């Protein structure tokens, strides 16, 4: 007899007392639902598996990479480069799924918590990949170059392109200018303490200043976080007018706030995605290092790859927000990601340096310092009046193009 027949018999029999019959039916339905034996449960499970096929694909990809690692090395640099590119693409796609579920959580809690969840998930990916690569690499400048690249990508790349495209479509786009000012001064302070002052610290005192930097970054971020979610939360939000909809037509004003699945499910998939990224990143870094060894590739290419992987989900989210005329979300994402990268990555990596006894070179080069100052000055001017436009976006995007040019020049 089938499951449906068994259920029908157990619930419709007249032999048992009514109270016992109701209780047994309730227990039966609960068990069948928890085991996914109902049509609704099967449909939901199938839908989740279909949506998260990229996460599932990462598991056999990691197994294949593990089993073929030595064969790829023996095949030469070209094979290693192809394997690294494939893994980078897969890591980016998984990062986008992580960002997707971060957006689901963000839609449930609203700003500023929403964009904070998104940027923290991106920073978690970046720190994890950095830690894995640093365990296999002897480059003392990788952390510095990655943070510098992330700031260039976030402010000049993401903010610049979003303001440019949004300005071309909507003209002037409003946002809360308090957020731009707050982010700007925090980024300047954090980068000054952690990436400019170290140039003047005696080598024998690096561990003392490293410990101070950790405390300073944590103190800055703790107060910033308290203000962002507390008394000054209005700094990071903007009240956009609701669009009117014709009678009889459903409102799609919150189409972007996807309500797919539960909060625990999204949290679980974010954690699973970050773990899978870490596993794939270990193989990716090995293959990429092997393929670039002895070539004329720019020294900072690995750092740019790490920064791009962590920023890739934010790029799509920011562009969608700009084209919807939601510039506040763009500012929170671009500037918030830059701040989070500096203020959270630095203490973690400095802590690793103190633990291992091997210092990193955190002081920026003169070219990097000049680019950061030009970027932050331009951001301070452009984000000072509560509206962005295409010209302001173009200035940042040209700075991003300059960053790419300097990368290929080895600067």
Residue ranges and their predicted role:
Residues 13-14, 30:
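Intrinsically disordered, charged low-complexity linkers and terminal tails
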Residues 34-411:
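Hydrophobic alpha-helical segments, chiefly the membrane-spanning helices
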